[in-house]
Amino acid sequence: MSTNQETRGFQSEVKQLLQLMIHSLYSNKEIFLRELISNASDAADKLRFKALSAPELYEGDGDLKVRISFDAEKGTLTISDNGIGMTREQVIDHLGTIAKSGTKEFLAALGQEQAKDSQLIGQFGVGFYSAFIVADKVTVKTRAAGEPIDKAVLWESAGEGEYSVADIEKKERGTEITLHLREEEKEFANEWRVREIIGKYSDHIGLPVEILAKEYDEEGKETGIKWEKINKAQALWTRSKGEISDEEYKEFYKHLSHDFADPLLWTHNKVEGNQEYTSLLYVPSKAPWDLFNREHKHGLKLYVQRVFIMDDAEQFMPNYLRFMRGLIDSNDLPLNVSREILQDNKVTAALRKALTKRSLQMLEKLAKDDEEKYLQFWKEFGLVLKEGPSEDFANKENIAKLLRFASSKNDSSEQTVSLEDYVARMKEGQKAIYYITADSYIAAKNSPHLELFNKKDIEVLLLSDRIDEWMLSYLTEFDGKQLQPITKADLDLGDLADKEQEEQKEQDKTFSSFIERVKTLLGERVKDVRLTHRLTDTPAVVSTDNDQMTTQMAKLFAAAGQPVPEVKYTFELNPEHHLVKKVADLADEDEFANWIELLLEQAMLAERGSLENPTAFIKRVNSLLS
């Protein structure tokens, strides 16, 4: 008998997610059983962990398992576990709301394209709600470990906007979920169909999965029913690598991550010696939708001596590898370990170092063995990996080998060129790795700063991701070669510079009075005015000194709401350009000033992508054109 019954409305995001999920995931509907068994396995893990300090929570029943039964006549499928269970408050929190930050943003990202929706929803992790793909009504009975028998909870919903919750009596600890299958989904109340799905998706979990199966005598006559274990019930990572198939590794990844897509690659290692641990690390094939959300949960599942301790243990991976999924099972950490203890622990630090190295080696091997697959990884996670040089000085060189860039040698914005590629084809006499940062690939590709480099056939890396400037403030050299921006006023090309030195000196003398005239006109608005011999088609550019903040770094500070120091540019004029020659000969001071202002504004526009006073610029152009 139920008491204290109430009907409540789903959180609006749940309603929306249920409808999208039922339609988008219908083609892969059998995954509902994998999701529910995974949840049951997690409930058992959590009970084991709590029982380490409170063994009475087992209530005399420490034989943890998942049981599945079905009633073909009624069209029901029931999944039950004797794990941690839930209180009334937990039921409302977990089954009535989605307690994930960024849920609204996630739902906004969903479009009308079904395949894309399916992939996004898979990344989000639908868990319990997947039951509604095949059921038109779901009933949950649950009692939390340690709670009295009369403090169990009944939850029911047809998935259409509301649910009911009531107090009931339940003798057994744990959770029982009954799916009232839709008419067209009655196949899931069939023993052999259930066996097939469990064999496919849940053979690898460490918890026994039992089904209520019919027994037969030697003549094939039915003699009764009994609970039969139908999975291996041995944690996959404890088995030897040689006996685990790729398919099993892939399904275990999906169990761990609740991702629907196969992983891109994985590494499974057992380490003995000073430290004893087993790690199973995966690289997903797709970035999660909330990878750049500050509250995005990441980290590895932590086990100690095969006992589950916690999800999302962030302490074992640096932030720039937050896309890595998997688990670590340590023999050296205490069973009563907490997040606080992990934070300041020598064992944790050693494990983090080893797992970071293992992850980078796995990616380096992929880059060498399968360039196409690596570029697929780079498209998904390259931006995150670019955080590495600022976070991990010890592995900076290894991270640098994994970076990929667009190049002036390619006609595509695709980031495919490594620093090793660049160094291998450097010109004789070239001492530096040259790059340019800009707001976009198009802006970088068409920057006037590239003109001399294109003329001399010197490769320049084209960087246009917002993080690039920040990354390069930490990554200043590679393989003994300095990384040098081509936008600096004091750029030294060394042996690669133009050979016409005498002719240039003559030009400097010829234009010296012109340069002084421009300096007088612009005054403190620029740091310096000089002639440049690195332009071919452009009349003027602006540049910064080595000790100054670059344009892109200033933009980065501004976007982050940080105070930005004033950037004073050096104004460089091309003495070979007909416009500069024309302006140098002007006697009328107003006309001279107008042209110099225009050339400066053009140079600023090319460098910054915007002007402080675009209206004045337009008026000046119109005035000079009329």
From Swiss-Prot:
Region named C: 556-626
Region (B): 340-555
Annotated compartments: Cytoplasm
Major place of residence: cytoplasm
Record keyword Chaperone present: yes
Xref: SUPFAM superfamilies: ATPase domain of HSP90 chaperone/DNA topoisomerase II/histidine kinase, HSP90 C-terminal domain, Ribosomal protein S5 domain 2-like
Purpose: Molecular chaperone. Has ATPase activity.
Family stated for the protein in its record: Belongs to the heat shock protein 90 family.
Name of this protein: Chaperone protein HtpG
Species per Swiss-Prot/TrEMBL record: Histophilus somni (strain 129Pt)
